[in-house]
């Protein structure tokens, strides 16, 4: 146990003195000629003085330490009731006063030796108990300043019982108490080794500057870093530097693979053998964990024991990460891979995600987690997340996607919802309070978007109050009278316009029906054919259907920036120094393969707050409860989606049916598929 600070350590100094006295009388006992009455008398006088000091020490402890502790803790009692100091003093007095014949003297000497041996065997453990049990209790029940005051009184009382020489000697001993305690605790070899480490020389590694040591630490794996942190305080601080813990792979580490580099260099497709072993480990561990009353004498197979042991090792490693490492380095973690974990749980994942707000790559493939794993995700909690793999997490539901959408935040283009607060002269504090909502629909004002009636309505644009944006050919922008009410900028031969609020035809009539970006070309044309539109006469309105065919690639539209009438409203989001357009909703990879409880509701939750403008990879294989309508609504807000990396069930008639890659779970033995068993 580590020593306590010297100024509040109540036992080490006095106990060192007591141990020194024990050593002295043991030495005298072995060197005394008991057949010589003078030698025996000198020994008894020395023992009498020694035990009087023991008695004085006991009284000081009772009055200034144990007595105070008993006032605050009722669990402390009878501490010094059985040390037999008084009986020993009576024994010494009897030996000094009575004149004995030779026979009685031999019996007395034998009794003296036995009683001293018994006392010594009890007294030394008693002092150790006080140091290891009562000192921590005192630190718990008394403040630091109270402990310092008690220490001063204890020292003063011990010194008051000695003459000037003893006083000076005692002060010197107590000042060196901590080092002397170490001398008693460790062997001669350990002491020599410790002293050699503390002696600094010009060639010692401890003389290197921290920058050089940190550079050396970058070549160490996580296991070596943990060992280095136990060397001394300086190394412990360096080992907790965030840059050394950017990539975490606990599942690999628990199995002896201490890789800690970028995930790009890992094989993302483990073989079936590896997956099968992880499944066996998980199953064996769950069966063992569920039966807490299992008979230890019951024989289990060697392979099952190995699986349980491996899962237990993984669980211990995860707990150590959560309690001892992530609180210090969590903000620097970019990669967290727990794919095929045997022992992880929703609670552990939730704690890890709370400590790691700047994650970019999260892989929870085939883990036994539920929606509660993401309870810690508040608004904007993972704006930097680029990659999330939830393949095989068959317990998650639409609630997880709602939380993910909330945590991804809102890009600057969608913060126009705050203009309502701005126009009502609401304070910045009111806006910030709204940002703390757990529902992105509440933050953006799109609370009706979770309603099935909303998505069943063909004219969805009427429920969105932000000014519409129109895209048309810059070679024919429209009438000059109309252009007076427009604000536009040219990008790649296109005009991107936003209409001023004064143009009322954009809040009702034909103009309000056009919502490029929420409708595909085909969907928009079908809607216009079916809707009864009373045209207002604007050239722009008449050109809408014509110019919709000239839209550029989705990636070009994503990079076009527009400014509204109040676009320089104060940014109320954390990290406002950097562009939200770049920071928020940066997700590029989303895999929900085998998550069969996901429905259209969850997919549509991802469309709120700006959709997923940078999403390139979307895997919905085995999501049996989604429909073509839900897929269409999500894809419409994912302009960067690559058809080659777009997977969904072959039985669903959805978007990009001719070019999408279909279902990946066909003939898969461990993930949901509607054709399982074929």
Swiss-Prot record:
<feature type="binding site">
    <location>
        <position position="61"/>
    </location>
    <ligand>
        <name>Fe(3+) 2</name>
    </ligand>
</feature>
<feature type="binding site">
    <location>
        <position position="130"/>
    </location>
    <ligand>
        <name>Fe(3+) 2</name>
    </ligand>
</feature>
<feature type="domain" description="F-box">
    <location>
        <begin position="202"/>
        <end position="248"/>
    </location>
</feature>
<dbReference type="Pfam" id="PF12937">
    <property type="entry name" value="F-box-like"/>
</dbReference>
<comment type="pathway">
    <text>Protein modification; protein ubiquitination.</text>
</comment>
<comment type="subunit">
    <text>Part of a SCF (SKP1-cullin-F-box) protein ligase complex.</text>
</comment>
<dbReference type="InterPro" id="IPR012312">
    <property type="entry name" value="Hemerythrin-like"/>
</dbReference>
<feature type="binding site">
    <location>
        <position position="673"/>
    </location>
    <ligand>
        <name>[2Fe-2S] cluster</name>
    </ligand>
</feature>
<feature type="binding site">
    <location>
        <position position="663"/>
    </location>
    <ligand>
        <name>[2Fe-2S] cluster</name>
    </ligand>
</feature>
<dbReference type="GO" id="GO:0048471">
    <property type="term" value="C:perinuclear region of cytoplasm"/>
</dbReference>
<dbReference type="InterPro" id="IPR001611">
    <property type="entry name" value="Leu-rich_rpt"/>
</dbReference>
<feature type="repeat" description="LRR 6">
    <location>
        <begin position="595"/>
        <end position="622"/>
    </location>
</feature>
<keyword id="KW-0832">Ubl conjugation</keyword>
<feature type="binding site">
    <location>
        <position position="61"/>
    </location>
    <ligand>
        <name>Fe(3+) 1</name>
    </ligand>
</feature>
<keyword id="KW-0963">Cytoplasm</keyword>
<keyword id="KW-0479">Metal-binding</keyword>
<feature type="binding site">
    <location>
        <position position="15"/>
    </location>
    <ligand>
        <name>Fe(3+) 1</name>
    </ligand>
</feature>
<dbReference type="GO" id="GO:0005506">
    <property type="term" value="F:iron ion binding"/>
</dbReference>
<feature type="repeat" description="LRR 7">
    <location>
        <begin position="623"/>
        <end position="648"/>
    </location>
</feature>
<keyword id="KW-0411">Iron-sulfur</keyword>
<dbReference type="GO" id="GO:0006879">
    <property type="term" value="P:intracellular iron ion homeostasis"/>
</dbReference>
<dbReference type="InterPro" id="IPR036047">
    <property type="entry name" value="F-box-like_dom_sf"/>
</dbReference>
<dbReference type="GO" id="GO:0031146">
    <property type="term" value="P:SCF-dependent proteasomal ubiquitin-dependent protein catabolic process"/>
</dbReference>
<feature type="repeat" description="LRR 5">
    <location>
        <begin position="566"/>
        <end position="594"/>
    </location>
</feature>
<feature type="repeat" description="LRR 1">
    <location>
        <begin position="314"/>
        <end position="340"/>
    </location>
</feature>
<dbReference type="InterPro" id="IPR006553">
    <property type="entry name" value="Leu-rich_rpt_Cys-con_subtyp"/>
</dbReference>
<feature type="repeat" description="LRR 2">
    <location>
        <begin position="341"/>
        <end position="366"/>
    </location>
</feature>
<feature type="binding site">
    <location>
        <position position="80"/>
    </location>
    <ligand>
        <name>Fe(3+) 2</name>
    </ligand>
</feature>
<dbReference type="Pfam" id="PF13516">
    <property type="entry name" value="LRR_6"/>
</dbReference>
<feature type="binding site">
    <location>
        <position position="130"/>
    </location>
    <ligand>
        <name>Fe(3+) 1</name>
    </ligand>
</feature>
<feature type="binding site">
    <location>
        <position position="58"/>
    </location>
    <ligand>
        <name>Fe(3+) 2</name>
    </ligand>
</feature>
<dbReference type="InterPro" id="IPR032675">
    <property type="entry name" value="LRR_dom_sf"/>
</dbReference>
<feature type="region of interest" description="Hemerythrin-like">
    <location>
        <begin position="1"/>
        <end position="159"/>
    </location>
</feature>
<dbReference type="InterPro" id="IPR001810">
    <property type="entry name" value="F-box_dom"/>
</dbReference>
<dbReference type="GO" id="GO:0051536">
    <property type="term" value="F:iron-sulfur cluster binding"/>
</dbReference>
<comment type="function">
    <text>Component of some SCF (SKP1-cullin-F-box) protein ligase complex that plays a central role in iron homeostasis by promoting the ubiquitination and subsequent degradation of ireb2/irp2. Upon high iron and oxygen level, it specifically recognizes and binds ireb2/irp2, promoting its ubiquitination and degradation by the proteasome.</text>
</comment>
<dbReference type="GO" id="GO:0005634">
    <property type="term" value="C:nucleus"/>
</dbReference>
<keyword id="KW-0408">Iron</keyword>
<feature type="binding site">
    <location>
        <position position="57"/>
    </location>
    <ligand>
        <name>Fe(3+) 1</name>
    </ligand>
</feature>
<feature type="repeat" description="LRR 8">
    <location>
        <begin position="655"/>
        <end position="678"/>
    </location>
</feature>
<feature type="binding site">
    <location>
        <position position="126"/>
    </location>
    <ligand>
        <name>Fe(3+) 2</name>
    </ligand>
</feature>
<keyword id="KW-0433">Leucine-rich repeat</keyword>
């Amino acid at each position: 146990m580590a020593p306590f600070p010297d100024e509040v350590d109540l036992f080490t100094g006095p106990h060192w003195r007591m141990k020194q006295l024990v050593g002295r009388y043991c030495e005298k006992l072995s060197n005394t000629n008991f057949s010589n009455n003078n030698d025996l008398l000198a020994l008894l006088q020395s023992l009498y003085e020694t035990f009087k000091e023991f008695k004085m020490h006991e009284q000081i402890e009772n009055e200034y330490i144990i007595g105070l502790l008993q006032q605050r803790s009722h669990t402390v009692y009878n501490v010094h009731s059985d040390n037999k100091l008084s009986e020993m003093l009576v024994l010494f007095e009897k030996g000094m006063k009575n004149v004995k014949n030779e026979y009685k003297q031999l019996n007395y000497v034998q009794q003296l030796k036995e009683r001293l041996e018994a006392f010594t065997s009890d007294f030394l453990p008693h002092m150790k108990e006080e140091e290891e049990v009562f000192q921590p209790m005192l630190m718990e029940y008394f403040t630091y300043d109270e402990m310092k005051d008690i220490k001063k009184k204890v020292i003063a009382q011990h010194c008051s019982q000695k003459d000037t020489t003893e006083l000076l000697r005692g002060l010197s001993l107590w000042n060196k108490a901590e080092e002397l305690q170490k001398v008693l605790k460790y062997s001669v070899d350990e002491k020599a080794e410790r002293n050699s480490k503390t002696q600094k020389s010009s060639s010692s590694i401890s003389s290197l500057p921290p920058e050089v040591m940190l550079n050396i630490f970058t070549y160490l794996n996580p296991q070596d870093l943990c060992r280095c942190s136990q060397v001394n305080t300086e190394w412990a601080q360096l080992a907790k530097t965030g840059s050394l813990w950017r990539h975490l792979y606990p599942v690999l580490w628990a199995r002896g693979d201490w890789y800690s580099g970028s995930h790009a260099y890992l094989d993302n497709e483990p073989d079936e053998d590896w997956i099968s072993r992880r499944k066996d480990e998980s199953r064996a561990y769950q069966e063992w964990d569920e039966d807490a009353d299992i008979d230890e004498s019951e024989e289990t197979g060697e392979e099952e024991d190995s699986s349980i042991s491996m899962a237990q090792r993984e669980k211990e490693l995860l707990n150590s990460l959560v309690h001892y490492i992530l609180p210090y380095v969590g903000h620097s973690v970019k990669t967290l891979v727990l794919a095929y974990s045997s022992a992880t749980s929703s609670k552990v994942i939730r704690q890890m995600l709370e400590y790691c707000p700047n994650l970019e790559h999260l892989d929870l493939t085939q883990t036994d987690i539920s929606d509660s794993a993401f309870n810690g995700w508040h608004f904007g909690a993972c704006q930097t997340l680029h990659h999330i793999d939830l393949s095989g997490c068959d317990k998650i539901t639409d609630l997880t996607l709602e939380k993910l959408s909330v945590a991804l935040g809102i890009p600057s283009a969608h913060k126009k919802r705050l203009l309502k607060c701005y126009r009502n002269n609401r304070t910045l504090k009111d806006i910030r309070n709204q940002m703390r909502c757990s529902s992105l629909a509440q933050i953006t004002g799109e609370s009706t978007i979770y309603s099935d009636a909303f998505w069943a309505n063909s004219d969805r644009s009427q429920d969105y109050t932000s000014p519409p944006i129109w895209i048309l050919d810059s070679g024919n922008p429209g009438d000059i009278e109309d252009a007076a009410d427009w604000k536009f900028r040219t990008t790649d031969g296109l005009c991107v316009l936003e209409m001023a609020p004064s143009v009322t035809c954009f809040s009702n009539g034909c103009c309000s029906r056009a919502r490029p970006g929420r409708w595909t070309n085909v969907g928009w044309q079908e809607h216009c054919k079916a809707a009864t539109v009373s045209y207002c006469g604007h050239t722009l309105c008449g050109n809408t259907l014509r110019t919709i065919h000239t839209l550029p690639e989705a990636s070009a539209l994503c990079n076009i920036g527009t400014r509204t009438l109040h676009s320089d409203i104060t940014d109320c989001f954390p990290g406002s120094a950097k562009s939200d357009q770049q920071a928020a909703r940066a997700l590029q990879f989303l895999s929900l393969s085998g998550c069969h409880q996901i429905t259209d509701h969850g997919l549509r939750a991802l469309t709120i707050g700006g959709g997923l403008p940078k999403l390139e990879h979307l895997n919905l294989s085995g999501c049996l409860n989604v429909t073509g309508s839900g897929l269409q609504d999500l894809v419409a807000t994912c302009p960067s989606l690559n058809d080659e990396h777009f997977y969904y069930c072959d039985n669903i008639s959805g978007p990009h049916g001719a070019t999408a890659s279909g279902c990946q779970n066909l003939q898969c033995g461990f993930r949901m598929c509607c054709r399982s068993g074929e």
